[in-house]
């Protein structure tokens, strides 16, 4: 069993930021990541532009300089790799945490796909991007249905449905149209979401107006088959459209089960873990959370730009305990 002073589960920007803050108080935390560093950003659409400006994505006082105000995915990947190198953050990549158990003497045993560790402090920064919100409709498990969008090229000359009406849906629809797909967007809301990036909405609306994109508001998907999608538009009758592929961009949620198994209490309504906002410590002493996982089901509440500060609260609390 390997002893560590602190273990961070999750190597996204907020987990890496926590590692840097812990280094500043003399704790060289180990980051355990099931993919590689900033795995969620790697899984973003290939041509993704960030909502935040580059300086709001900075961690560890390492400057993130880009020619445009808002960086793109590949620039962010390069930046966070550089931070890991420059700050000598220890990252065990491609290692999956299987189980976290609290022992009688207030330490934790962390079992992974490769090793077993023991530590007094466990920081969970696992994000939410691995767990899509399923619609629960027949056919959602067909191989032609995706909950992540990478790029448009494979869908050239195909009939594609995008489900959802927020940024990820609009981004996917625009990329698909550029690649020559025939796109229908089904959104259960009655108007465009106010959260859509203001610089892409005009382009999207223009494509809807000229008929390039078919936009259906008040649309509820009833079922998906090999060659069709059936939906209900408002109170009207069922509508069936020809379909080759579906992108269900219906959002994501944190892994509640993982937290609950450790003993962290979750608010059933909001999906938010119980934690002290000043220290980021949960109801389980020694277990802290960092990043979007603290927001529960409302992923629009915490981003990299505010989640990156959680590590400072955690480090301050741990420093207090270590100095007693």
From Swiss-Prot:
Disulfide bonds: none annotated. It holds the Pfam family Pyr_redox_3. SUPFAM superfamilies: FAD/NAD(P)-binding domain (SSF51905). The keyword Oxidoreductase applies. The modification S-bacillithiol cysteine disulfide is found at residue 220. The keyword Oxidoreductase applies. One of its GO terms (molecular function) is flavin adenine dinucleotide binding. C-terminal Cys can react with bacillithiol (BSH) to form mixed disulfides. S-bacillithiolation protects Cys residues against overoxidation by acting as a redox switch in response to oxidative stress. It is an enzyme of class 1 (oxidoreductase). Its cofactor is FAD. Its EC number is 1.8.1.-. Keywords: Flavoprotein, Oxidoreductase, Redox-active center. Interacts with BrxC. S-bacillithiolation is the formation of mixed disulfide bonds between protein thiols and the general thiol reductant bacillithiol (BSH) under oxidative stress. BSH is an equivalent of glutathione (GSH) in Firmicutes. This protein is a NADPH-dependent bacilliredoxin reductase, which debacillithiolates (removes BSH) the S-bacillithiolated BrxB (BrxB-SSB), and to a lesser extent BrxC (BrxC-SSB). Involved in a redox cascade increasing the efficacy of BrxB function by reducing BrxB-SSB and thus reactivating it. This is Bacilliredoxin reductase Bdr. It comes from Bacillus subtilis (strain 168).
């Amino acid at each position: 069993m390997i002893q560590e002073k602190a273990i961070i589960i999750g190597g996204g920007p907020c987990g890496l930021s926590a590692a840097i803050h812990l280094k500043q108080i003399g704790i060289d935390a180990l980051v355990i990541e099931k993919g590689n560093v900033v795995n969620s950003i790697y899984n973003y659409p290939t041509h993704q532009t960030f909502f935040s400006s580059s300086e709001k994505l900075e961690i560890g006082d390492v400057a993130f300089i880009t020619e445009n105000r808002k960086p793109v995915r590949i620039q962010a990947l390069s930046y966070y790799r550089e931070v890991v190198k420059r700050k000598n953050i220890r990252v065990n990549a491609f290692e999956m945490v299987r189980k976290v158990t609290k022992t009688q003497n207030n330490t934790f045993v962390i079992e992974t796909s490769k090793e077993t560790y023991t530590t007094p402090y466990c920081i969970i920064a696992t994000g939410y991007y691995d767990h899509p919100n399923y619609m629960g409709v027949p056919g959602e498990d067909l191989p032609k249905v995706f909950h992540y969008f990478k790029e448009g090229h494979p869908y050239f000359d195909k009939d594609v449905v995008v489900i959802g009406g927020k940024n990820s849906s609009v981004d996917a629809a625009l990329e698909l149209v550029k690649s020559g797909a025939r796109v229908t967007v089904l959104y259960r809301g009655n108007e465009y979401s106010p959260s859509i990036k203001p610089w892409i909405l005009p382009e999207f609306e223009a494509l809807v107006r000229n008929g390039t994109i078919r936009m259906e508001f008040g649309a509820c998907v009833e079922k998906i088959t090999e060659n069709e999608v059936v939906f209900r538009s408002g109170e009207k009758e069922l509508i069936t459209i020809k379909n080759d592929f579906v992108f269900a961009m219906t959002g994501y949620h944190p892994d509640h089960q993982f937290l609950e198994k450790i003993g962290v209490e979750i608010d059933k309504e909001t999906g938010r873990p119980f934690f002290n906002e000043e220290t980021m410590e949960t109801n389980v002493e020694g277990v802290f959370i960092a990043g979007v996982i603290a927001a529960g089901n409302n992923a629009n509440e915490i981003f990299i730009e505010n989640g990156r500060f959680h590590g400072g609260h955690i480090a301050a609390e741990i420093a207090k305990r270590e100095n007693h």
